[in-house]
Amino acid sequence: MQDTAKYLIHADITAAGVVERSDVVGAVFGQTEGLLGDELDLRDLQDSKKVGRIDVEIRSEGGQSFGEITVASGLDRVETAILAAALETIEQVGPCRAEIEVSEIEDVRSAKRREVVERATELLNDFEEKSIQTADIVETVRQQVRVADVTDYEGLPAGPRVADSDAIVVVEGRSDVMQLLKYGIKNAVAVEGTDVPDAIADLTAGRTVTSFLDGDRGGDLILKELAQVGDVDYVAVTPSDKSVEDLSRSEVMSALRDKVPYETVASAKSLDSIREEMSQAGESTTADGGAVAAATSDDAADNQPSPSSQTGSAKVETTDGTTSVVDNSNATAVADATTDEETTENGDGPTIPSLSDHIEAVIQTHSGTARLVDEDATLLAEGDADAVVSLLESTEDVPKTVVIDADCSQKLLDVAAQRGVDVVVAAGHGEYVKQPTAVQVRIES
């Protein structure tokens, strides 16, 4: 009955003499019989399993007896209270005067509810510790894919296209290879230290080799030794105070696009010096951009490319298996990736808007719309701000930035993290509990 009881009646008993348990039980049944009528007769209630057994704990001390009576009840609250009050009418136990006082009517279900709450709290805490957030799932999958793509070339970390590609990118460590894989470059190989392995030296023979090293002391040493034991065709340098593994996609592509022939910087003392020379050359090229473009156009019309000019192009293997050619000679055409940009500079093509232009058009004009743009600020999709989540889910290309004339919501952040969006530019902070670590929120008003 204890397992199905709703209430427990606790009563204290005091007897002026020595009594035993059987005396107490007999007094309870005997002196309550007929007191409450047939419906609440204690024996009938026990027979129908509405009242459990009567538990008595009794002890004698100094010629008196003390103890506790416990009765399990399956009746409702009113009937249980009546039954408890009936116990207090008992005045004699065996041959001794006695007094019974109900100390408590315990609600067994309340105790069970407390246990349920405590246990549920423990289970929930364990569950939350083991659960994976949406952003964590996305990042975990990305990392596992990157690690899976890292292959082994003569014991060195490398992209899957290193062995069969006619162009390779030499980097310092495994993390650099993984970073380039993240951006779709699959022909990178790591030297794993300042001592260039023989496998790398042999690999550079007969291939177009681009060194892409950190601009620190270690990078300087690797470049010098690589040039001594192998062949280096081009040098790409990272932005100041940055490592390859810390670069964004646009920074990686820009560095590889702007690489220079090794012969032109062979006398440089360090990668920092090369960076300075490239910066000065870039300023000079910008000043004379129109003339260079015109000369390039004439040369392309009058002359076929020679073998030497063809070797002036470096190749980068991308995720789709195609080979994009990036030409770094100041006298030849630039890479396809920059054709539209240079056409714009020469005034022959449409102007590509910047991210600031999108923000102004969407948020500052209170347009009530949303735009999805890529890393070059090219518009991928546009729609109503209220439908930005479905717009983001249905867009085939992964946008880098979402610009929305509305508050940033939790749903938008979750979907943005799933799609791999880097930045959400919104008109205001919305109600969101958790911001994914991979998504930056920027407020423009």
UniProtKB/Swiss-Prot annotation:
It comes from the Archaea. Binds two Mg(2+) per subunit. GO terms for molecular function: DNA-directed RNA polymerase activity; metal ion binding; poly(A) binding. It catalyses: ssDNA + n NTP = ssDNA/pppN(pN)n-1 hybrid + (n-1) diphosphate. GO terms for biological process: DNA replication, synthesis of primer. InterPro entries: DnaG_primase (IPR050219), Primase_DnaG_arc (IPR020607), TOPRIM_DnaG/twinkle (IPR034154), TOPRIM_dom (IPR006171). Its EC number is 2.7.7.101. Residues 303-313 have a biased composition (Polar residues). Residues 284-298, 324-337 have a biased composition (Low complexity). Pfam families: Toprim_4 (PF13662). CDD domains: TOPRIM_primases. Mg(2+) 1 binds at E172, D214. Keywords: DNA replication, DNA-directed RNA polymerase, Magnesium, Metal-binding, Nucleotidyltransferase, Primosome, Transcription, Transferase. PROSITE patterns: TOPRIM (PS50880). Mg(2+) 2 binds at D214, D216. One of its GO terms (cellular component) is DNA-directed RNA polymerase complex. Its cofactor is Mg(2+). Forms a ternary complex with MCM helicase and DNA. Belongs to the archaeal DnaG primase family. NCBIfam families: PRK04031.1-1. This is DNA primase DnaG. It comes from Haloarcula marismortui (strain ATCC 43049 / DSM 3752 / JCM 8966 / VKM B-1809) (Halobacterium marismortui). The gene is dnaG.
